[in-house]
From Swiss-Prot:
Uppermost EC category: oxidoreductase
Keywords: Disulfide bond, FAD, Flavoprotein, Host cytoplasm, Late protein, Membrane, Oxidoreductase, Redox-active center, Transmembrane, Transmembrane helix, Viral envelope protein, Virion
Membrane topology, Intravirion segments: 1-8
Gene name of the encoded protein: OPG072
Top-level taxon in the UniProt lineage: Viruses
Record localization: Virion membrane; Host cytoplasm
Oligomer and partners: Interacts with OPG128/A2.5; this interaction involves formation of a transient disulfide-bonded intermediate, allowing disulfide bond transfer.
Any one GO molecular-function label of the UniProt entry: thiol oxidase activity
Topology Virion surface: residue spans: 26-95
Names of required cofactors: FAD
Taxonomic source organism: Vaccinia virus (strain Western Reserve) (VACV)
Function: FAD-dependent sulfhydryl oxidase that catalyzes disulfide bond formation. The complete pathway for formation of disulfide bonds in intracellular virion membrane proteins sequentially involves thiol-disulfide transfer between OPG072/E10, OPG128/A2.5 and OPG088/G4.
Protein name, as recorded: Probable FAD-linked sulfhydryl oxidase OPG072
Length: 95
């Protein structure tokens, strides 16, 4: 399934989950939700790419919410189809 049809919605959910963890402080629940989202992406190639990136960057073993947050911002920026959609990390406040 083409990410063009579902990508923005999934990225919105990912950043909502991260923001919620910034409010409630439950990093473990956040990581479980994020891993569930990534491991059920409708595109097998996207699922594989995201899962490998999470594993290669030790996201699931991190207790630093901002490390996880900025990881997903970098992942989003790497996958953005057009540079105009990239997130300017200099304008992002830590959670």
């Amino acid at each position: 399934m083409n990410p063009k049809h579902w990508g923005r919605a999934v990225w919105t959910i990912i950043f909502i989950v991260l923001s919620q963890a910034g409010l409630d402080g439950n990093i473990e629940a956040c990581k479980r939700k994020l891993y569930t989202i990534v491991s059920t992406l409708p595109c097998p190639a996207c699922r594989r790419h995201a899962t490998i990136a999470i594993e290669d960057n030790n996201v699931m073993s991190s207790d630093d919410l901002n490390y996880i947050y900025y990881f997903f911002i970098r992942l989003f920026n790497n996958l953005a189809s057009d540079p105009k959609y990239a997130i300017d990390v200099t304008k992002v406040n830590p959670l």
